[in-house]
A protein has these predicted regions:
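Short coil/turn segments that connect the beta-strands within blades of beta-propeller domains
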Residues: 27-29, 79-81, 131-133
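Blade-level signature of beta-propeller repeat domains, shared across WD40, Kelch, NHL, RCC1
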Residues: 123-157
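Structural motif
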Residues: 39-51, 91-101, 143-157
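Short loop/turn segments immediately following the C-termini of beta-strands
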Residues: 34-38, 42, 87-90, 129, ...
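A short beta-strand motif characteristic of beta-propeller blades
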Residues: 2-13, 58-65, 108-114
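Short loop/turn segments that connect beta-strands within beta-propeller blades
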Residues: 53-57, 103-107
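Loop/turn-rich, solvent-exposed surfaces of beta-rich toroidal or solenoidal domains
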Residues: 65-104
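Repeated scaffold domains used in trafficking and secretory/extracellular systems
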Residues: 12-24, 68-76, 118-128
């Protein structure tokens, strides 16, 4: 049975909004990651990160940053860094993906890695192998012509 999370505090809840990534923060909390606005790189867009406490079932906004990206397609948290997968261009133009790096302690956007290809990002996760953090991101074609999993070594260990 699925458990419904009350997301009524989100801007545009129930409409087309950019709140589309959930990842584990710690044993008690999940992070909900998304953007305000249309998801098409407007100057007023913001990245918002919310914490969802699994015990109290309470969703609270943690922080907000200026944002110059488009649709969020996935997120993962490891070693104090929040990695966010996005498309790199607006709707119906699929020419690649980005992985953004956010230092959550300092609430600061650190970096963006751009991957150019005829497709878009589809999810994001990590794995620690031999003490190194690797990011795994789905790379998919909107036309259904291909689907790959990309493996990227994190520069932020």
């Amino acid at each position: 049975k699925a458990e419904r999370v009350d997301v009524s505090i989100l801007d545009g809840a129930g409409t087309k909004s950019g709140y589309s990534a959930v990842c584990e923060y710690d044993a008690s909390n999940l992070l909900l990651v998304g953007i305000t606005g249309t998801g098409t790189d407007r100057p007023t867009d913001k990245l918002r990160v919310y914490k969802y406490n699994k015990g109290t079932k309470k969703l609270t906004q943690w922080f907000e940053l200026s944002w110059h990206g488009v649709f969020v397609q996935g997120a993962t948290y490891v070693n104090g860094m929040l990695y966010i997968a996005t498309n790199i261009s607006e709707e119906k133009i699929h020419d690649g993906a980005s992985v953004w790096v956010v230092d959550v302690k300092n609430q600061k956007l650190l970096d963006e890695m751009v991957i150019l290809f005829d497709g878009e990002a589809e999810g994001l996760d990590y794995n620690i192998e031999d003490g190194k953090t690797w990011l795994y991101m789905g790379l998919g074609s909107p036309a259904g012509k291909f689907a790959y999993v990309g493996r990227f070594k994190s520069l932020y260990q």
